[in-house]
A protein has these predicted regions:
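Membrane-interface helix-loop-helix modules in multi-pass membrane proteins
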Residues: 69, 73-110, 530
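The feature marks cytosolic C-terminal regulatory regions of anion transporters and related permeases
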Residues: 396-554
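Helix-loop-helix junctions within the multi-pass membrane cores of secondary transporters/permeases
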Residues: 12, 76, 103-121, 125-129, ...
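Core transmembrane helix bundle of multi-pass membrane transport proteins
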Residues: 2-29, 90-312, 377-432
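Membrane-embedded helical hairpins/re-entrant loop segments and their flanking transmembrane helices
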Residues: 12-25, 33, 37-71, 276-358
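Membrane-helix interface "capping/anchor" motifs
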Residues: 66-77, 220-226, 352-357, 400-408
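Alpha-helical transmembrane segments of multipass membrane proteins
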Residues: 38-41, 61-69, 88, 114-115, ...
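Short hydrophobic alpha-helical membrane-embedded segments
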Residues: 27-34, 51-58, 78-79, 204-208, ...
Length: 554
């Protein structure tokens, strides 16, 4: 039974009754996407058994669906967290030991996520400059591609050990964090020709064909093939080739999971919190990474999916963050990689016709069913096929289109973007984002922003008449003082004619302009009007409507 296309779908059990077939179908299609991706993400994250990536997606679907503040997002493990989780596992020694200790970081970070939501910190994503965030995501994409290339080539795991571990600290028996800057990306790149020379011919063929399929499908814009998830075709072709080449005789070539019931009955709780006392500095560092980057990526997805929602429903970001934190606490205790609201599966969910949160629930149920009855099929999937899917995910984060977009915004944003990428890859994500933030502050000051305006919004609301409001901003409108301006705007009475007057601002940066246009869309969707005014002498630093603008008088 389906609803009228103009009627907003109901939530809860009523929503399931109204949209059962649509959500069931979408949930099944997303399941076909999620299964191979969840396996690949878990493996790439350093989790010994990839089944735990699927367990994360199951919890995200079956449990978090009903805790979530968003209706159409799909919760599950994310490629964007691969460098962080794999880095965390390696920092604690790698293998089983590193996994158990990394789970301690995941659980503590998850509790922090819950607190973020309860303290209504869902808006903190607005504080970060857009160029720095996009730089971080592009850097993550590049890291994913680099780390998956050896697997695509079928390189045996023992040739990768030196590229993934640092010098062991005799005091702890763990890799010295000082030797592991940038998750060893620089060292991995230097050693790549030597590493790839150990390729396996049959696995390389499977990997390359898988890569051609997943990239080729991205160019299909319509027709029957567009409706088929590319990962499904990749897995079918890869399994067929794997059987033909008899790669089951090649060590480490195929996914190995074991039976779900056997794994969970043997050891249901896998977390180890001893890292808190043995190496507290390393523990705290990775907790911060997981909590901040995971929360940020999830919040950005929620915002993006709200824009794609056919009914323009608004999510509760704080509730969603709390739900994700609760889900991650459970997955961390059991052994899974952390989940976020994942953008690729969520946008596909909308494309497949999902109407309510039940699509996420059904996708989780199908995943659970697969682990109960389809393990023999899962265990003939070649790892190079999963590597191809992850390389494509990395490419989406760091595509040439992203670089062109940042250049279109202006040289200031492009510089911040590039510097953030370099520092994230050479050092770590937190240092990279912090560098991007500081660089944007410096560029804003160089453009004429006053230091006293960096963190203080100077905005007043004037009521012209009963139906007309003016928000007059003086000083500078910057990412670093935007939350104060946003607070005044969201508190305005709905349904009025609002003018955001930026004519007296010396500097209006890109992040603020972009956020104001989003607020404008939200306000007008609720029946009001909003106009954003800037001075005729404001000069844009780029070619976009939201490029940074600087007031040039005389």
């Amino acid at each position: 039974m389906s609803t009228n296309s103009n009627q907003i779908p109901k939530d809860g059990l009523e929503g399931m009754k109204q949209n059962f077939l649509a959500d069931l179908q979408s949930g099944f299609m997303v399941f076909l996407l999620a299964l191979p991706l969840s396996l690949g993400i878990a493996k790439a994250s350093g989790i010994p058994n990839p089944i735990f990536g699927v367990i994360t997606a199951i919890i995200g679907g079956i449990i978090v669906s009903f805790l979530s503040g968003s209706r159409l997002t799909i919760k599950g493990p994310a490629a964007g967290l691969i460098p962080i989780i794999s880095g965390c596992v390696v920092a604690f020694g790698g293998g089983e030991q590193g996994w158990h200790l990394a789970l301690g970081c995941i659980v503590v970070a998850s509790v922090i996520q819950v607190l973020f939501g309860l303290l209504k910190m869902g808006n903190f994503a607005d504080f970060f400059p857009g160029a720095a965030i996009h730089g971080m995501l592009a850097s993550i994409g590049i890291m994913i591609i680099i780390k998956q290339l050896p697997i695509l080539f079928g390189v045996a795991g023992n040739f990768l050990k030196d590229a993934h571990t640092g010098v062991v600290d005799p005091a702890t028996g763990l890799p010295d964090p000082k030797t592991m800057k940038g998750y060893d990306i620089v060292g991995l790149v230097k050693n790549m020709p030597s590493i790839l020379s150990h390729y396996d011919q049959h696995l390389l063929i499977i990997g390359v064909i898988s890569l051609v399929i997943v990239f080729g499908f991205s160019f299909i814009k319509s027709g029957f093939l567009k409706k088929i998830p590319a990962p499904l075709i990749v897995i079918i072709v890869a399994i067929t080739l794997g059987i033909s080449f008899m790669v089951k005789d090649t060590p480490g070539a195929l996914v190995k999971t074991g039976r779900l019931t056997d794994i969970l009955s043997t050891q249901f709780i896998n977390v180890d919190f001893s890292g808190i006392s043995s190496i507290p500095g390393v523990f705290i560092k990775w907790v911060i990474f997981i909590a901040l980057v995971g929360s940020l990526e999830s919040l950005l997805t929620v915002k993006a999916i709200d824009g794609l929602d056919p009914w323009k429903r608004k999510s509760n970001a704080n509730k969603d963050l709390t739900g994700v934190g609760i889900g991650n606490t459970l997955t961390g205790l059991i052994g899974g990689s952390p989940m976020i609201a994942e953008v690729v599966r969520s946008s596909a969910n909308i494309g497949f016709g999902a109407k309510t949160r039940w699509a996420n629930f059904f996708h989780g149920m199908f995943l659970l069913l697969a682990l109960l009855v389809a393990v023999p099929i899962i265990e003939v999937i070649p790892y190079p096929a999963l590597a191809a899917l992850l390389i494509f995910a990395g490419y989406r984060l760091a595509s040439p289109k992203e670089f062109r977009h940042m250049l279109h915004l202006g040289m200031d944003q492009f510089i911040i973007f590039i510097v953030t990428i370099i520092v994230c890859a050479a050092d770590d994500l937190l240092v990279g984002v912090a560098t991007g933030i500081v660089l944007e502050l410096i560029l804003n000051i160089v453009s004429g922003a006053k230091i006293g305006n960096l963190f203080k919004s100077r905005a007043v609301v004037e009521e012209k008449n009963s139906n007309q409001l003016v928000v007059r901003v003086t000083g500078d409108a910057l990412f670093s003082n935007y939350l104060g301006l946003k607070k005044k705007i969201v508190e305005l009475q709905k349904g009025k004619n609002v003018t955001i007057d930026l004519a007296q601002c010396k500097v209006i940066d890109h992040t603020t302009l972009n956020s104001l246009h989003e607020l404008q869309h939200d306000y007008e969707s609720e029946g009001g009007t909003m106009i954003i005014l800037n001075h005729e002498h404001h000069v844009a630093k780029g070619k976009s409507e939201t490029s940074t603008k600087v007031l040039k008088l005389g």
